[in-house]
Amino acid sequence: MRYEKKFIEVNGRRMACVDEGDGDPIVFVHGNATSSYMWRNIMPHMEGLGRLVALDNIGQGDSDKLPDSGPHSYMIKEHQEYFDAALDTLGVRENVTLVMHDWGGTLGLSWASRHPEAIRGFAHCEIVAVNHESYDSYRDGHGERLRQARGLDGPKIVLEDNFFVERVFTGGVMREIDEETMAEIRRPYEEPGEARRPTLSWVRQIPIGGQPANVAEQTTQLAAWARSSGCPKLFIEADPGQIILDDDYAEFDTWPNHAKITVRGLHHPQEDSPDDIGRGLAEWYKGIS
């Protein structure tokens, strides 16, 4: 990775982040089973355009694990507390552009909805945008993988067998993943048990069939905020993608000032089309600056 991570103290824990360059902040927010590493081939396209910030969410990447974690750890509320405090610690407060993937969309949109005056714009890719009706809504077996991870066998297959990294992450990449990349994805979750808890907690919070109810409600509220905000938006569409379904497209059509680029990829197009994403993102950003 060409970027060196630094560490900040947040709520008594160490969080890792990349913080490079000067100017208005461009904040890259990752989701489940990944870290700031996922942006390694996209951020170079943004160099010279602003201050590039990419956090490792708490319990992920090189950020600390939570002490005494268990089934109720790494809930969205807890992740949000660390994310918000990290941005505050880094002095990210105005003219902010968010680049969000997966659950990074929830963390970023929540922050944006509470700091609308601070937002310059946001880009999103494969985020949790709407409540999906059922596991059967998903394509190509992805719903069945989610059903397995969220079922009674979830703790065993995720915490013991590292199912989310070995099966779900890899199932979201089209190319043959090289050993260097897989080693970095596996590294934060090498130890079986609670070290892998973030990957289980995240997947169990995906709103499917209205459950969990609190996440379903938050997802609806954040979509409503995006609908009401005139800030510039960029939809980075992965083709064929994995979690963006007809209901998501219908929702995105209601978001004003919303541009789109399409790149080749499944759930993690950053691994298949990083240069296409980077070039499209840079062109869009220059247009809103």
Q: Which residue ranges define each predicted feature?
A:
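Flexible "cap/lid" subdomain of the alpha/beta-hydrolase fold that forms the substrate-access gate
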Residues: 1-3, 13-15, 53, 60-99, ...
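Histidine-centered active-site loop/cap adjacent to the catalytic His
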Residues: 277
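Active-site helix-initiating loop/hinge in glycosyltransferases
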Residues: 31, 272-273
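Conserved HGGG/HGGXW glycine-rich cap/lid loop of the alpha/beta-hydrolase fold
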Residues: 13-65, 86, 251
